[in-house]
Structures are given as structure tokens and as C-alpha cells.
Amino acid sequence: MLQNIIGRKREIELIENCINSNKPEFIAIYGRRRIGKTYLVKQLLGEKFSFYMTGVYQCSKNEMLAYFSEQLALYSGKKQPRPKTWFEAFSQLRAYLSTLLEEKEQIIIFVDELPWLDTPKSNFIRALDLFWNGWASDQPNIKFIVCGSATTWMTNKLLGDKGGLHNRVTRKIYLAPFDLNETELFLQSKGIVWTRHQIAECYMIMGGTPFYLNMIDKQYSLPQNIDMLFFAEGAELSNEYEFLFRSLFKDSILYRRIVELLAKKKVGMTREDVMKALHLTSGGKLSEAFNDLISCDFIRKYSSFGNKSNGAMYQLTDLYTLFYLHYIKGKEETDEHLWSNMIDSPSHRAWSGYAFEQLCLHHISQIKKKLGILGVQTNVYSWQQKANKEKGIEGAQIDLILDRRDQIINLCEMKYSLKAYDITPAYLQKLLDRREIFRQASNTSKALHLTFVTASGIKKNAQEGMIQSEVGLDDLFGEKV
């Protein structure tokens, strides 16, 4: 039911346009595990399915064919001999769907977790190729929808297939995690009454993954929920990290090594530095891993301002992973009430400061909207300059820079606090000095604006007047543009 879907307006529009088109459609919906792909399709179209089945993790070909046979009998109302191959299976599916061509305006087939059907030596891809190219692609009322969480498979075998399925997908839809606005709507739909500070901290821990958010119990506070989900004995999310990577990526060990390395470097690392640290001799697998991790929103690729030629930086930005690696992985003994006991501790303050920076990077469009520059061409950078005493070069770092076509550069400070942030005279001088260091290092002629992105605003004082623009927490909760 459409009213049960939170957010996803653009994705719903794309799917509905495909369903209502007058041509055959091969729709591939992909994204990381637990993000709500299956839920979206079932809520939107479940009552209209002419056939549905799902792959199951680590099931054999024979088990999957047996399940296919059961589903076909369920939808067709006729029991047939169990197929021995995927060629036979798709032939039976074609025969059944052919009986619907005249009576149904839309014939919707939904195959969920498609990658898990492609077991070794199963010839699944070839059979799917023959089904689509040999018949379904000529039927204007066929709407073939597939979903998959296994990113390596989806990008290599389907979306990037060089064989018969190359360019056959008519619509690719990537389902991203919720933003803050969608997270708030989701929690409200569950009867959870929290402040926006609490919702933001929840987002900083779990990210915008609906499956995780759905585990929250409305009768408990945020710290109590985090203790139960992450730190209590048998906590549901304490082992999620391992399975998440195994289910998404074929070579999950390499992907975890990359992520765990990047977790140690807040500003990120270059490709060459990652290769050297992991003792990799070939860059092919690393390039594929980077692309997959970016496409699943685990990491981001960015350029340092003025240093494009020195190679891109790769930075871990997935909030759940950052939290897990910081507080859970490798900890043999954990306090079952760790998060409740950590409120306002030095460790909590240090973590929340960095996590808030990552939250801001997930909401660049909301920041641009507040600054009134949605229609202005803007490049997003970070910047750092290492100190060199011999050359008289001072060190400096800016985590978010918005380089605008209208001759302004926003140098952004991201600050998380429960009270209005107090810009002291000493801190203002530090900001002004850093702005001048950046001006000299970048040799820019653009106007440099000091911009604060804060969780609780800026305290009104003499120094506050030197700040050109401010983005607040409520602005970050704005609807995605």
C-alpha cells in the first residue's frame, strides 16, 4: 500500500512510469542489504504480481528450482514437473505468462534477491538471457522487476554484463539509505517521540537503514535502545557487520580490510596508500572494491581542493560501520549498558563530533538549500595542508568546502553540541588565520565565507557576527531536493 511507504517519492515515480509504459520493461532495483528494496516493491505492486519468487542465501540450484516450481504452481494454479535446469524453469514461466498476454494489461514479474539464484555452474544467467531476449522483450505488457543486495554481482553480472544482457535493463534504480527527514518520518510512524537531537544521534549510530530503525522500541530511550541492540548479550546488531559484508560482496574479506583501514584515517586515504598498506600487487580488484563500496554508500571519493592531480581520497562515511568499528569490533568484554553510561563522556563527545561531520556529508543538498545555492554549480571538497617548519608552512585542515560558480567559497565548520556553540575570541582568531592560510595556499580570488553547520546553533556574542552563514539541525532535516 502506497500510504505505508515512507519517502521514496522519486523511486515510486520511476517505478510507476515503467509499469504504465507501453513497452516491455526490465527494471533493476539495487542497493545495500536491509535498505527496503523488497518492501518498496511489495507495498507498491504486491497485489498485481503475476509471478514472484526470491533467491535465498547459499541455497543450492536444486533447492531454488524446487521453490520456483512451487511458486509457479501457486500463481498459475497448475502443478508441473519440477524443472531440472533454469532453461526448463524459464520455459515453464514463459508458457504460463503467454496465457496472460491477452487478458492482462500489465504482467508484473518480481524476482527478489536475483544474485542468490546464480549458483555455481547453474547457467542461470544464460537462461535469463534467453527468457528476456528470446521472448519477454517482445511483449509490451511484460514488466520484469529484479532486486539484488549482492552489489558485486549486480554491477558485474547484470548492470555491467558484456553478454546477452548488456544494456537490456531499461531502468536502473538505486535505493539509498534514508536521510534525516525520512528517518524522522519513519520513527514517527512507529509512535517514537524523540527530539531532533536524539534522532540525529540515532542516525549517527545506525545511518538511514530502515531495517535497523525498525528494531527500535518506542517505550525506551535512545541510549536504552542502543544498549539493547548493540551491547546486551545476544544483541541483534552486534553481529550484523560480518553478515552484511558477506551478503553484499563476493570477496568480503578484501572489502572489510579496506573499510577497517579507512576507519583509522579520518580524512581518508589515496588509492596508492591503500594498496601499500594492504600489500596489494594489483590494482584491478581494488578499483572494483572501491566502486562497489561507493555504490553502497560505505565510502566516498573526493578531491582535496587544489590537489586534483595528486589523486582522489577515499573516506569511510557509513555511520553504522564507523560506530561498530569504534565501539564493538575487537572488544572482548562490553558493558551491557555502555551507551547509557557513556552519556556526555569524553569518548562520547569525541565520537559525536566526528559522526556529526559524516552526517553533514550525507546532507549536502540540504546545506546548499539553506545557503540558497541549489541552482548554483558547486563542487564539494575537503582540504588539508601539512605543516613544514623549514619552509615556514603552517598546517591546516578544512573538512567541508563548497566551491561555488558565483565566486564564493564556503569554508564549513561542523560542530555537534547540546547547547549553542560558543565561538570564543581565540577560536575566531584560529578560524581567521586558517582562512588566510587557505587563501594563500589556494591562490583563490573568490570571496571566502565562514560557514557553521551546527546541531544547536551559535551563541550570540561579538564573535558570532564575523560568521557569514549558518546551517542548523532543522535545516538538515529538510526534505531531499
What are the residue ranges of the model-derived segments?
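Phosphate-binding site recognition
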Residues: 1-341, 346, 450
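A cross-kingdom feature that marks ATP-driven nucleic-acid transaction machinery
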Residues: 305, 312-481
